[in-house]
Amino acid sequence: MGEHWALGPEAGSSLLLCSALLAVGCALGLRLGRGRSAVERWVLAWLCYDSLVHFVLEGAFVYLSIVGNVADSQGLIASLWKEYGKADTRWLYSDPTVVSLEILTVVLDGLLALVLIYAIVKEKYYRHFVQIVLCVCELYGCWMTFFPEWLVGSPSLNTSSWLYLWVYLVFFNGLWVLIPGLLLWQSWVELKKRDSQEANLAKKHK
């Protein structure tokens, strides 16, 4: 029982690195969102963290997977992916589906997150269009990462440990389902409100 609940040094350092990126992302987002509503400030905090994860962590994963593989690599970020690879071995040996999705995620989702940050800060008219596209891309990425694996019986997934199942697989991946889902809802509500305002304005001018 104690062994299943043990948190080793590799797991500790990986979680510490993720926490550091979260702290930096929140600090950047809250600073960029000064003078805005609490909701918008936390949206910016998430987007800053999101872009850091895409470029720093996933960007490094793509590089390591193209020049070799994570299992044979050294360094802090390689150690993080080795730790995650204990829960999903596809990340250790350059699984072509995972690497293909991650290339798309780094390039497209990372850039969209930066464009969305700019659109929010500068109050651009295309903000919610970009937000919807980014959220759909991230939800698609989660779907294509896990559903093909589940359809063949999840041979690469290790759910024997609470850490691997609930923290690595469910929590960390679930964030990119829950928050994009909430942001899609935010865009829906905002676009619906704008449409109602335009309809009311048109009625007044008739």
Swiss-Prot record:
GO biological process per UniProt: sterol metabolic process
Primary location group: endoplasmic reticulum
Entries under InterPro entries matching the protein: EBP (IPR007905), EXPERA (IPR033118)
Membrane-related topology note: Multi-pass membrane protein
GO MF term list: cholestenol delta-isomerase activity
Subcellular location: Endoplasmic reticulum membrane
Keywords, in A-Z order: Endoplasmic reticulum, Membrane, Transmembrane, Transmembrane helix
GO CC annotation terms, alphabetical: endoplasmic reticulum membrane
TM stretches of this protein: 10-30, 42-62, 101-121, 165-185
Record Pfam families: EBP
Domain annotation EXPERA: ranges: 39-184
Chain's role: Does not possess sterol isomerase activity and does not bind sigma ligands.
Subunit record text: Homodimer.
Protein name in the entry: Emopamil-binding protein-like
Taxonomic source organism: Mus musculus
